[in-house]
Amino acid sequence: MNIALVAHDKKKDDLIVLIKTYAHILKKHQLFATGTTGKRIAEATGLPVHCFRSGPLGGDQEIGAAVARGEMDMIIFFRDPLTAQPHEPDVSALMRLCDVYSIPLSTNMGGSEILIRSIEQGDFESLKLSHNDEPPA
């Protein structure tokens, strides 16, 4: 699976805790992330992470484009709901694309743990078959 990992500044440490905890599962998948988040994850875990640009510099949009092309299977995005983000429209657009293309999206630790454990159980096999270039009708 192709999994995108994104975290706002105040949530990066939480995301790293999650990735360390589930590294034994995530190492079997291709990990993608926005710039700083990806670098921090790679440094903290040793896992290979393909880094897009930083979120405010277009990284969220790059991940969104990958979603639209059917190249992402899951998004874990630890958002900071208490801090205004200058690129909030990009964040909203990414979340919208996840809804349009039925891509699992989690924005917090609890939901992310459920998604990652579901990967381990093979619960997303049918999802791979449903991806295509056209949004559902």
UniProtKB/Swiss-Prot annotation:
According to the entry, every stretch annotated as the MGS-like domain falls at 1-137
Q: Keywords, A to Z?
A: Lyase
Gene Ontology terms: biological process: methylglyoxal biosynthetic process
Q: Where is the active site?
A: D60 (proton donor/acceptor)
Q: Which reaction equations make up its catalytic activity?
A: dihydroxyacetone phosphate = methylglyoxal + phosphate
Q: Which CDD domains match?
A: MGS
Q: What PROSITE patterns has UniProt attached to this entry?
A: METHYLGLYOXAL_SYNTH (PS01335), MGS (PS51855)
Write the Enzyme Commission number(s) for this entry.
Answer: 4.2.3.3
The entry's cellular-component GO terms read: cytosol
What is the main EC category here?
Answer: lyase
Gene Ontology molecular function: methylglyoxal synthase activity
Report the SS bond pairs. none
| Pfam families per UniProt | MGS (PF02142)
Sites where the protein binds substrate? H8, K12, T34, G35, T36, T37, S54, G55, H87
Write out the similarity annotation.
Answer: Belongs to the methylglyoxal synthase family.
As for what it does, the entry says: Catalyzes the formation of methylglyoxal from dihydroxyacetone phosphate.
List the protein's name: Methylglyoxal synthase
Q: What is the name of the gene encoding this protein? A: mgsA
